[in-house]
Amino acid sequence: DFAVGAVDSCNGRLGAAGLENVRFRCADARDTGMRAASFDLVVAADLFEHLYPDDSRKVAREAFRVLRPGGTCAVWTPCPSHILEVLRNRDIILKRDISHVDYKSMPRMQDILTAAGFEIARAHYAESHLRGLNLAERLLQRWVPLLRRRIAVVAVKPGDP
C-alpha cells in the first residue's frame, strides 16, 4: 500500500489473525524494490482505477517481476459500465471519486496483464455487496452492462512453481 497508516494498521492485526507468513509493506507499486521472483501472490484490490495508463502498465510489469513462476496476480477493480459508477462519474446521487483517474474495461485490464507477460487464468464480473442489487447483478450482468459491478481477473506468471 502507499499509505503508511494503512500498512501499520494491517500489520498490527496479523498476530490476532494467526498469519505469520504475511507482511504488509509501504512501497511504490511501480517499483517496489522487492527481490525478483520472491512472491507467490500479488493482490491488486481497488488499485488500478487509481492509476494512469502508463502507471498501470508499470505496476503490471512489476507484479510480473516479483512473482515466482506459477505465481498469481489477482486484480479487483470497479467496472466503468456499472450503474453506480455511471451515476458517480456524473455526480448524480453519488459524489464522484476524483482519485479514480482511469477506469479499465475487462478487455483492457486483461490486455494490460497479458502485455506484462501474464496468462489469464480466470476473468469475470463480480456482483456488489448490496442486497437486492447483487441478485439482479448475478442474474442479469451477462446481458446488462449496467449491472457489472466489479472486474475480477486472476492472472498467472507462466512457468513451473
Where do the language-model regions lie?
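Short conserved loop adjoining the S-adenosyl-L-methionine
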Residues: 31-36
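S-adenosyl-L-methionine-dependent methyltransferase catalytic module, highlighting the catalytic core
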Residues: 2-9, 13, 17, 30, ...
